[in-house]
């Protein structure tokens, strides 16, 4: 399988992997009933006809099913991965072979990453995208910061706070020189809205809303119950240990594992390690989450307590500097350190750059400290489940990506009469329940139906929604 004749608007590792990718996409479709049902229901209506979606989300087999669902609903699409290690090269090749522009290679450099992100916004045939589908907020940030600099506020470009910002800001400077005047303003004016996949990106959106700088309506997909309580929890429960095992071949049973953070991702991560036979420690800043962890039987400690005790360390907080250089110096020889939060700054990887690095295999490095102690770092502190393994299973991603599809429809086709302002929204409870319902038959669930008198007794409709908006699942 090769790309369509004359189509070369893509960058992938090896287009000859497309046939392999297509076979795996076919397998994944069987495990993604929500997306397939969405194609069947909405395909004839073409609600995304005319939509030009700039997608920045891990270019995996499951994402390929999402991309082809959006296309089946009428959208024109350009796609990049939102992490330098998360691309599955056969998935990217299959999408390119289908004639959809994609720019994604597993192990791309930071310079490549930001160059590819910029390519999202130069639409083939001219023009710009009118929708963003984001994971982590980098595509959204590219436009916001590009417009800020274009409008004259450029001081921040000379003050990068990380290696990644240094590369990103250099790209923005280049764009300001090479692109026509008003380039970012034209992109910003074209876009109708953004749907955001993950916790980190949602934090960025709420920060912009609070500051009054959010350029378009946004839908927070992450806080749909059928995303956060399934993808974040059950997805991590399966994929975390998969990544650690593939990276290290270590025996998990009997090891002491430390999980930083006990939100939904941390809960899934702790369960993953416990099921593998680890003795699990947890750290938390939130007394409610700390109490939950203790009631689940985990020992709640600080990172300082855990550093000399644990064999395996996992960060899952969405915050920065969770594992510091001081913590790493206190660890056992060849402790395994990894992250399952979106960005690599949960671990102070930058502080290790001047130490001796020995690459064991792709995304597995041994770092030697001056005293001879060694540490195993997975995926350079980026997402371990996607860098060292294949990410979450297809079934749980079907729920997340069905929410993404419905969010794109809401913002593009259903934003009538100013329904959505320049604010952050969540999908209504009725759609959350719909997404769940679409996945029941696949796993043999028989749903009990309320009788009319029962529905009246608890004050709900027979067909739902069954819970109030403030209900915590």
UniProtKB/Swiss-Prot annotation:
Residues engaged in binding NAD(+): 198-200, 232, 261-266, 284, 319, 340-342, 385
Free-text remark on how the cofactor is bound: Binds 1 NAD(+) per subunit.
Known pathway: Amino-acid biosynthesis; L-homocysteine biosynthesis; L-homocysteine from S-adenosyl-L-homocysteine: step 1/1
The reaction(s) this protein catalyses: S-adenosyl-L-homocysteine + H2O = L-homocysteine + adenosine
EC number: 3.13.2.1
Protein transport found in the keyword field: no
GO biological process per UniProt: L-homocysteine biosynthetic process; one-carbon metabolic process; S-adenosylmethionine cycle
Stored InterPro entries: Adenosylhomocyst_ase-like_sf, Adenosylhomocysteinase-like, Ado_hCys_hydrolase_NAD-bd, NAD(P)-bd_dom_sf, S-Ado-L-homoCys_hydrolase_CS
Domain of life: Bacteria
CDD domains (UniProt xref): SAHH
Record-stated family: Belongs to the adenosylhomocysteinase family.
NCBIfam families cross-referenced by the UniProt entry: ahcY (TIGR00936), PRK05476.2-3 (NF004005)
Name the record gives this protein: Adenosylhomocysteinase
Species per Swiss-Prot/TrEMBL record: Bradyrhizobium sp. (strain BTAi1 / ATCC BAA-1182)
């Amino acid at each position: 399988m090769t790309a369509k004749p004359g189509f070369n608007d893509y960058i992938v590792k090896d287009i000859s992997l497309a046939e392999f990718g297509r076979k795996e996409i076919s397998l994944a479709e069987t495990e993604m009933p929500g997306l397939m049902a969405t194609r069947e229901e909405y395909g004839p209506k073409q609600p995304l006809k005319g939509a030009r979606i700039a997608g920045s989300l891990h270019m995996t087999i499951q994402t390929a099913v999402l991309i082809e669902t959006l296309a089946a609903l009428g959208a024109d699409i350009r796609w990049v991965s939102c992490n330098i290690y998360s691309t599955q090269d056969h998935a990217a090749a299959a999408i390119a072979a289908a004639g959809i522009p994609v720019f994604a290679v597993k192990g791309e450099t930071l310079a490549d990453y930001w160059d590819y992100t910029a390519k999202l916004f130069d639409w083939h045939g001219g023009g710009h995208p009118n929708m963003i589908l984001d994971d982590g907020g980098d595509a959204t940030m590219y436009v916001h910061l590009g417009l800020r600099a274009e409008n004259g506020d450029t001081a921040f470009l000379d003050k990068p706070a990380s290696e990644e910002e240094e590369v990103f800001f250099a790209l923005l400077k280049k764009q300001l020189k090479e692109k026509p005047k008003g380039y970012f303003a034209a992109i910003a004016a074209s876009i109708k809205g953004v749907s955001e996949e993950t916790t980190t990106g949602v934090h960025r959106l709420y920060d912009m809303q609070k500051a009054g700088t959010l350029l378009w309506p946004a839908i927070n997909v992450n806080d749909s119950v059928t995303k956060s309580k399934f993808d974040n929890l059950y997805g991590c429960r399966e994929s975390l240990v998969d990544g650690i095992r593939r990276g290290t071949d270590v025996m998990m049973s009997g090891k002491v594992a430390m999980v930083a953070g006990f939100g939904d991702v941390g809960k899934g991560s702790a369960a993953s390690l416990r099921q593998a036979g680890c003795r699990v420690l947890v750290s938390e800043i939130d007394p409610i989450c700390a109490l939950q962890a203790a009631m689940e039987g985990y020992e709640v400690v600080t990172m300082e307590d855990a550093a000399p005790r644990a064999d395996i360390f996992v960060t899952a907080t969405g915050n920065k500097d969770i594992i510091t250089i001081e913590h790493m110096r206190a660890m056992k020889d060849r402790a395994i350190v990894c992250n399952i939060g979106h960005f690599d700054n949960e671990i102070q990887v930058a502080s290790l750059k001047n130490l001796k690095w020995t690459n064991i295999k792709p995304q597995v490095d041994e770092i030697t400290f001056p005293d001879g102690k060694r540490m195993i770092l997975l995926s350079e502190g980026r997402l371990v489940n996607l860098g060292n393994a294949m990410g979450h299973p297809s079934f749980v991603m079907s729920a997340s990506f069905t929410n993404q599809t419905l969010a794109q429809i809401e913002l593009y086709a259903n934003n009538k009469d100013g329904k959505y302002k320049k604010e952050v929204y969540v999908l209504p409870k009725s759609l959350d329940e719909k997404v769940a319902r679409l996945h029941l038959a696949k796993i043999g669930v028989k749903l009990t139906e309320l009788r009319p008198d029962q529905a009246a007794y608890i004050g709900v409709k027979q067909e739902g929604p069954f819970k109030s908006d403030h209900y915590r699942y």
